[in-house]
Amino acid sequence: MTFDALLLLSFGGPEGPEQVMPFLENVTRGRGIPRERLESVAEHYLHFGGVSPINGINRDLITAIEAELSRRGMQLPVYFGNRNWEPFVEDTVAAMRDNGIRRAAVFSTSAWGGYSGCTQYQEDIARGRNAAGPDAPELVKLRQYFDHPLLVEMFADAIADARDTLPEPLRADARLVFTAHSIPLRAASRCGPDLYERQVGYAAGLVAGAAGYRDYDQVWQSRSGPPQVPWLEPDVGDHLAALAEAGTKAVIVCPIGFVSDHIEVVWDLDSELAEQAAEAGVALARASTPNAQPRFAQLAVDLIDEVIAGRPPQRVPGENPVPGYGSSVNGALCTELCGA
């Protein structure tokens, strides 16, 4: 299989105060979220001038991917499309069509399976192609990459860097806590039994081992919606409170569920959780995400090369008890389980 282009597909985010509410309305469309709740969330963005870091990080990642493609002698233009804000995926796919692109690889900024981590991106692809009409390019979503060696390496290195920011006497006993985005239990049951949770748990174990930790915790963050709807638990804030009560003096939090330092990292962890830790007398260090590292660009191009060359997926050696689904075409589901 060959490709004419690469599409980086992401979530999107506002880039000015006037964009915050329209963006949040796009994100929550059809979910009946009260406006007062949206206004409360909007304050998180307005704290940073109404600008989410995600689009800037993705543009930097595209630059890094272009450099990696050039280094490998692969002449592929890189396009950028989002689900919830400009550049919208529908507009990007139309531009690809107009530029004569016939088949493109799609790299999404989610390493995971499950509805939120994978299926929604398949829906984005299908929606973009439908909007572009019969001459839309074929779009091949690249595989889930939660167990790619470079992802594990980047997070392990980030943990070491975060540990070094703690006061030296606290480093040895600092508790390592992995966190990922919580989802409703109903959503967690789609795409196979507990697929998302199992992938996150497996990846956390790989990263902990690579970072030299045998003991660690894995929790969830950033839940939303009505309190009567059950979501994955424990919450990172509740877990931090329990650690503080048990006498823990230092915590390293690794946001393994995210590939960039977007608003749910810089607000939920760097602001809210950091404030909670300070009040509890716990030293908190947050590991960085891959963002636009050259290694993350290398990972993206590795996935393209796997498809072009028909190579087996690069995975951390050893037995993997957790499924990770491969590439799929034009928004088709990676597994029929996601249609259940």
Swiss-Prot record:
Record-linked SUPFAM superfamilies: Chelatase (SSF53800)
EC nos: 4.99.1.9
UniProt GO cellular component terms: cytoplasm
Binding-site residues for Fe-coproporphyrin III, renumbered to this chain: 52, 121
GO molecular function, one term: ferrochelatase activity
Keyword Methyltransferase in annotation: no
Keywords attached to this entry: Cytoplasm, Heme biosynthesis, Iron, Lyase, Metal-binding, Porphyrin biosynthesis
Subcellular locations according to the entry: Cytoplasm
Family from the record: Belongs to the ferrochelatase family.
Entries under NCBIfam families matching the protein: hemH, PRK00035.2-1
Protein name listed in UniProt: Coproporphyrin III ferrochelatase
